[in-house]
Amino acid sequence: MRKQVALVTGAAGGIGFEIAREFAREGASVIVSDLRPEACEKAASKLAEEGFDAAAIPYDVTKEAQVADTVNVIQKQYGRLDILVNNAGIQHVAPIEEFPTDTFEQLIKVMLTAPFIAMKHVFPIMKKQQFGRIINIASVNGLVGFAGKSAYNSAKHGVIGLTKVGALEGAPHGITVNALCPGYVDTQLVRNQLSDLSKTRNVPYDSVLEQVIFPLVPQKRLLSVKEIADYAVFLASEKAKGVTGQAVVLDGGYTAQ
């Protein structure tokens, strides 16, 4: 991965930041992207302070003109773009009959349309290079249903389909496209959701883990962001050149049941 250039969206924190860090640790030049400029700059600065080659480019992944501009800037500055990680995501939970249509459409836009737009604009560069690694962060919710997550599940199922099409179109040009499907991961977003649930149920945080999450996960634990990042590194590596069009599951056994 040394001397390669990687763009990671939604990289100001959580899984995205850890993926950016692990890519940088492997020697890649990393472009940290996020909708929030200050958080984006802070994340890139943190990586730079750790001695890594990192730059911040904040932009809205749903705005095609901004995506095109970002890809052009990267191409001009680095002369190449080897790795794309589509990680940006948002969440909303509600029964179908109570789910606001505009919220549903926004989730689809961020987590399905945005990866399509990004792939659309990096494919020409990767085809010209005859090399590319695209990793779409999907979810176990892209493989199974989950009540209350109609938009999230629809987007994640869709991005797995997009991944397969991208893999077929990219294969003749040295481009691999895969989807990572994490289960429950120890991120701030998940911790906030569990904290809200503990308040709603008036039970301790650990009780929420024991009563709600662990019955679903045979390993009885949350995955770490580094576990997800390590697998992203593998998929971007030469060792995984034969892996493409796959929905790779890391879920502590959740979908084995």
UniProtKB/Swiss-Prot annotation:
The keyword Transmembrane helix does not apply. The keyword Oxidoreductase applies. NAD(+) binds at residues 34, 60-61, 87, 152, 156. Coiled coil: none annotated. It is an enzyme of class 1 (oxidoreductase). Gene3D superfamilies: NAD(P)-binding Rossmann-like Domain. The active site is at residue 152. InterPro entries: 3-OHbutyrate_DH, NAD(P)-bd_dom_sf, Sc_DH/Rdtase_CS, SDR, SDR_fam. One of its GO terms (molecular function) is 3-hydroxybutyrate dehydrogenase activity. Pfam families: adh_short. Keywords: NAD, Oxidoreductase. One of its GO terms (biological process) is fatty acid biosynthetic process. Its EC number is 1.-.-.-. It comes from the Bacteria. Belongs to the short-chain dehydrogenases/reductases (SDR) family. This is Uncharacterized oxidoreductase YxjF. It comes from Bacillus subtilis (strain 168).
